[in-house]
Amino acid sequence: IGDLVIGALGKRAATLEVVGDWNHTGVNGEMHALTGAGLFGLATSMSTWLLPLTPIRYRGHVTRADQKVTMRDFVETLPSTTPDAPVILVVGTSMSAGKTTAARIVVRMLAERGLRVVATKLTGAARYRDILSCLDVGADYVLDFVDAGLPSTVCPATRYAAALDHLLTRIAMLKPDVIVAEAGASPMEPYNGATACDRLKPLVTLSILCASDPYAVLGVQNAFQLRPDIVAGPAANTTAAVELVKKLTGVRALNLRDAGAAEELRMLLDRKIVAPLQT
């Protein structure tokens, strides 16, 4: 038979990698591992850049006392509450636009200031690697949508909204000084990113848009009336790109791997996040 593995059935709609859905699985039970973290479904479209996905075959559900076990069985019912800590929101124009890199840099800078930092990934397909990497740079806690019972946020908006409410409640219980929140993919994709951004809008003190190129910055800005504090990612890789972002949108772009730009970000964080917390 081969190895037996446990995962979660779900959907993925990655613009640069894989599209798949467990609902498309045929009677033969053949499907794929849509992520390395155990999101299972039948791949229906895949980038030619990728190696072949791991093929798997459905053998049955995990059960306990003759009842199907689901991720939501392990989500504790909690009284709803909203965090009162400032939120740094990191959004992107697509996947692989530098969001996690930017989040890690921000987390490290805030941790160096002695702040209690919670890092969270609000949307995407289950892959714990991204958010877990924030622990390595000083986050006190990390949480994502999996902790709210979702293997992927490609789901009905009502279901996602309930999961997001639980996630924010969990974060509030940790009493952070500051929250670094990454919205995976982009707000225009079917991961409920727009829902997440709307829900957090009253809490956001600083926003970073990670973009694949300067024109993508303009597209997201126009589509969502989103004016970030700074732009990062490939759209800030060169001085030509930085100048074009400024010309198109009026927003400052920073190559966060550059020492001078990183220092500019640190001063921005000190002014908008650290100083108000110390008063």
Regions found by a protein language model. Give the residues of each.
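Loop/turn positions that initiate beta-strands
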Residues: I1-I6
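Short, charged beta-turn/beta-strand-edge "cap" motif at the junction between a beta-strand
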Residues: L9-A14, S47
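Conserved catalytic-core segment of NTP-binding enzymes
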Residues: E17-V18, H24, A33-D73, A157-M173, ...
